[in-house]
Amino acid sequence: METAKHFGSKLRKTLAALLATMALMAVLLPGALAVDLNVDVGFYFKQSRGGTCTLASAAMMLRRRAYLDGMDSWVDVTENGIKSTAWSGGLSHSFTYNDMHVGYATLPSGKAAKTEALVSILAEHPEGIVLYDRTRPHAVLLTDYTNGVFYCSDPSNGVASGRVPLSAASISIGGASCYCCL
């Protein structure tokens, strides 16, 4: 009888340990498997010619979304590759590329309102957004807002490559007026 009691106690402890391990995995595993889009694995590039900053920024945004969705063809998303559906003398305000629909919207006025709106938009769009500054005129891929800093990839050849603080880019939040996103 003593052996059955011991076995039951040991079984309960083993099951409790197993359940605790599974609970811990459920909490930690999603973070471990999450894709870090802030690590450049080839998302970013410079515009191929003058006047195509919006097209290049849109291609980088689509590339990041395709990567995030696990599409092997994300590397094939290029400025020239999206041009036939996304370009009409400028970036189209609405287009679809490989089942990814891009739309256009305007930002509120005032730097504080723009900042608040962009933080919220980026939280919903980890692939980033195409941010356009009509005062320049120029566009960048706004990628994230981390530790109080906006980051972007500026397709202009006069700015460092890759993900850089928006303050190092050729546009500003204050001058931004509109954006495109998925």
What does each model-found stretch correspond to?
Residues 17-27:
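Bacterial N-terminal signal peptides
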Residues 3-18:
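Bacterial N-terminal signal peptides that target proteins for export
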Residues 47-56, 112:
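Soluble non-cytosolic domains of exported or imported proteins
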Residues 28-37:
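Sec-dependent signal peptide cleavage junction
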Residues 36-44, 59-182:
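Conserved active-site-adjacent core of cysteine acyl-enzyme catalytic domains
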Residues 10, 55, 180-182:
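Residue-level detector of bioactive/disordered segments in secreted/extracellular proteins
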